[in-house]
Design a protein with these regions (language model features):
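Hydrophobic transmembrane alpha-helices and immediately adjacent juxtamembrane helices
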Residues: 4, 8, 16-17, 21-310
Length: 310
């Protein structure tokens, strides 16, 4: 099964960069006018409008190749756990051990009700794992795909979608921990959980928006991933993951200054049975829009140089 998937993925990647015949020619004709060899274009004389147009074509071409991105992301997971007995569920098992040990320990140290704290930390750990995974993988989304980018006609945005797919699959595996903990402690979010769906959509948009500039900057400056990793470690402790927001008391409003908190709350609160406040949503939407604007501007500026930085 793995061999067939790998063969199909390799064939799909190779098929983008070589002339097609027969039925494949029809697909090539449909894709090539829009995506072309856009990953390897570098024209110093381009105007800002032309750079923006090529960047939009790159994103649009990547979205049209979502099946390839899905296959590559799934293949990354399969290859990472090749030969393993539990496969990706090793990550689920390690998350479950972390949640149970930290949950009992911190509930005892901070004198909190374990029935309230354990579901909170289980959900927080899993959701934070997705956020930190996207940021970490986004830093290397282009450098790890160096061979493909430098040799195959493919939009750069495919590598961003690949990161998103890979982390969504890992989030799906870790969601088992949330389901089990919620069942053990009789947590029933009710219809409020539906508010998590637009939150996940906002997450996907923000994830794509953060991966593009991070991938480009880290391709140019190879020390940036280590800096980002250190920042994420600090953000873990500054964000209510292992501690509750109401523990700040009268200073709880300061959490709004933490962008990770705003994005985390629009998914976490509905799954805990309470809808996030309007001020949380406004902050999360504002953060997402700012990320998208910054990402578009930077990607349009440096997109043509990425392949030469690898």
């Amino acid at each position: 099964m793995l061999g067939r998937v790998k063969t199909n993925a390799v064939a799909a990647v190779r098929g983008i960069g070589r002339p097609a015949t027969g039925s494949a020619a029809f697909m090539s004709d449909r894709l090539s006018p829009s995506i072309g060899n856009i990953a390897l274009e570098f024209r110093p004389g381009l105007t800002a409008t032309e750079r923006a147009r090529f960047a939009v074509q790159d994103v649009a071409g990547g979205l049209r190749l979502w099946r390839l991105a899905w296959t590559l992301g799934w293949l990354d997971i399969r290859l990472r756990y090749r030969g393993s007995l539990l496969g990706p569920f090793w990550l689920t098992l390690s998350t479950a051990i972390m949640v149970s040990s930290l949950g009992v320990l911190y509930a005892t140290l901070m004198h909190m009700d374990v029935h309230r704290y354990l579901p909170f930390i289980a959900l927080s750990q899993v959701l934070w794992g997705f956020i930190s995974g996207v940021v970490g993988d986004g830093c290397v989304c282009f450098t790890q795909a160096e061979g493909i980018i430098r040799s195959v006609r493919m939009p750069l945005f495919v590598q961003v979608l690949r990161v998103l797919v890979r982390n969504l699959l890992m989030l799906g595996h870790n969601a088992v921990v949330i389901v089990v903990v919620f069942a053990l402690f009789s947590v029933r979010p009710g219809w409020q959980a539906l508010w998590a769906l637009p939150g996940v959509a906002a997450w996907a948009l923000a994830a794509a928006a953060i991966c593009l500039p991070l991938g480009a900057v880290c391709a140019r400056f190879r020390d940036v991933p280590q800096i980002v990793g250190s920042v994420m470690q600090i953000a873990f402790f500054l964000t209510p993951i292992i501690w509750l927001p109401d523990q700040l008391g009268p200073h709880e409003h300061l959490l709004l200054l933490n962008p990770f908190f705003d994005l985390l709350e629009i998914v976490r609160e509905p799954l805990l049975g309470t809808a996030a406040g309007s001020h949380i949503w406004m902050a999360a939407v504002a953060i997402t829009l700012v990320l998208c604007g910054f990402s578009c501007a930077l990607f349009a500026r440096v997109r043509g140089r990425v392949a030469f930085w690898l």
